[in-house]
Design a protein with these regions (language model features):
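Conserved catalytic loop of SAM-dependent methyltransferase domains
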Residues: 32-38, 254-279
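A short hydrophobic/small-residue beta-strand
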Residues: 138, 207-208
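Conserved N-terminal segment of class I S-adenosyl-L-methionine
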Residues: 1-173, 177-181, 191-194, 257-261, ...
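Short N-terminal helix/helix-N-cap motif within the alpha/beta-hydrolase-1
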Residues: 188-192, 219
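A short His-aromatic
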Residues: 182-186
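Short, glycine-/aromatic-enriched active-site segment of Class I SAM-dependent methyltransferases
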Residues: 33-35, 39-42, 209-235, 240-246
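Short glycine/proline- and charge-enriched loop/turn segments
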Residues: 39-45, 83-90, 222-230, 269-276
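A short glycine-rich, Lys/Arg-flanked "PGG" loop and its adjoining helix->strand segment in the class I
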Residues: 191-206
Length: 313
C-alpha cells in the first residue's frame, strides 16, 4: 500500500440504494466482500490493471435485477483514490479510441452532425483525439486522474477538467453528444450522473455509453471469477437494467447492443481468468515475441447504449 494514497486504517463504508428503484432493503446477497478496505490504494483504482479478484459485497435488487456493490467507500475516498490513480494503458489506448470512434460513427448515422462532444472519464483524451479527427469542432473531457491528463496531446490538455463529473461541472445545455466508456459501472451515484448528463445535453442531444454487460454469456458462466466482479465497480448492468436506468432518468433509449472490442492478444491474455502459474509465464512469452501485439477482435461481455434527450413538444 502506498502511504500517500491509501484509505484510512478503518474506512467507513456507506450503504447504497438501488439507483433504478430508489430503495434500500430490496436486495439479496450474491457475493460476500473478500478484501480488507484498509488495504485499498490508488493502484487498485487504476484503469485496466491486471484483475486481482477483489470486490465489495455484491447484491442483486429483487425488483429490477440490478447487480451492485453494497456497501462501498464514500465519495471522498473514491475521489482521492481515482485522483491518485496511475495511467498504465497507453499501449491499449490507440485500439480503444478507434473502437469507440467506430461506435460513435454508427450512433450518429442519420443524425445531424454534432458541433460539441464531452467525454466523462476521458483518461488521456485518446477518444477525444479521434472525435476531433472526425470533424467535431468542440471536444471536452472530465477526468479525475491528473497523471492521465498529463499524457494527453498538448492541444487537448486545456480541454480536460481534472475533476469528478457532476451536474455543476458545466453549464446546462452545453453539448450535442456526451460519451462515457467503461466509466458508468464505476460511478457511486449512477442516477445522479445520468441526471447531470441530461442537464448538460442540448435538446435533441445524445448519450453513447459502453460498459460491462453482466448478462453476457461469458460473465454469467464465470460468475464471481469474471473480471467485471471488481472493487472498482459500484454497479453492473445487463441490457434490461441499462435500458431502465436511462429511462427513469428521463432519456429515450434508442438502442442497447453488444460491443465488439479490438485489443492486442497480450491484453486479452492479461484479462483471462487463468491461474497465475499459467498466466504469468504466458504473458512473459507474449511480451518477448511480437505475437502479443496481434490485434484480436472479440465480443467480450460489453454492451453499448444510445439514448436521447427529446426536444420539448
Amino acid at each position: 500500500v502506498h502511504a500517500s494514497d491509501a484509505v484510512t486504517p478503518a474506512p467507513r463504508l456507506v450503504t447504497t440504494r438501488c439507483p433504478i428503484c430508489g430503495e434500500e432493503g430490496t436486495d439479496r446477497e450474491v457475493y460476500p466482500a473478500n478484501f480488507d478496505p484498509a488495504a485499498l490504494d490508488s493502484a487498485v483504482f487504476s484503469a485496466r490493471r491486471t484483475p486481482d479478484r477483489l470486490h465489495y459485497r455484491m447484491v442483486r435488487c429483487v425488483r429490477c435485477g440490478l447487480l451492485r456493490s453494497n456497501p462501498i467507500l464514500p465519495l471522498e475516498d473514491l475521489s482521492r483514490l481515482y485522483g491518485a490513480s496511475r495511467f498504465t494503458y497507453q499501449r491499449e489506448a490507440e485500439f480503444t479510441g478507434k473502437t469507440y470512434a467506430t461506435y460513435l460513427r454508427r450512433a450518429l448515422a442519420g443524425r445531424p452532425w454534432p458541433r460539441s462532444l464531452m467525454e466523462v472519464g476521458c483518461g488521456s483524451g485518446f477518444f477525444l483525439s479521434e472525435a476531433a479527427r472526425m470533424g467535431i469542432e468542440e471536444v471536452s473531457g472530465v477526468e479525475p486522474s491528473q497523471e492521465a491528463i498529463e499524457h494527453a496531446e498538448p492541444r487537448l490538455r486545456d480541454r480536460i477538467r481534472c475533476a469528478l463529473y457532476d451536474s455543476e461541472t458545466f453549464e446546462a445545455e452545453r453539448f450535442d453528444v456526451i460519451c462515457a466508456f467503461q466509466v458508468f459501472d464505476h460511478v457511486p451515484d449512477p442516477a445522479g450522473m445520468l441526471r447531470a448528463c441530461f442537464r448538460h445535453l442540448r435538446p435533441g442531444g445524445m448519450v453513447l455509453f459502453i460498459n460491462h454487460d453482466s448478462g453476457a454469456l461469458t460473465n454469467r458462466l464465470l460468475g464471481e471469477r469474471s473480471p467485471i466482479v471488481d472493487v472498482e465497480h459500484t454497479a453492473l448492468y445487463d441490457r434490461s437494467t441499462m435500458r431502465r436506468i436511462l429511462e427513469v432518468t428521463g432519456f429515450t433509449v434508442q438502442q442497447v447492443f453488444g460491443v465488439k472490442n479490438t485489443y492486442p492478444l497480450e491484453y486479452w491474455t492479461r484479462l483471462a481468468p487463468l491461474p497465475s502459474l499459467v498466466k504469468d509465464p504466458l504473458l512473459k512469452a507474449l511480451e518477448r515475441s511480437r505475437v502479443g501485439e496481434l490485434p484480436v477482435s472479440l465480443y467480450a461481455g460489453n454492451l453499448g447504449a444510445i439514448a436521447t434527450k427529446e426536444r420539448p413538444q
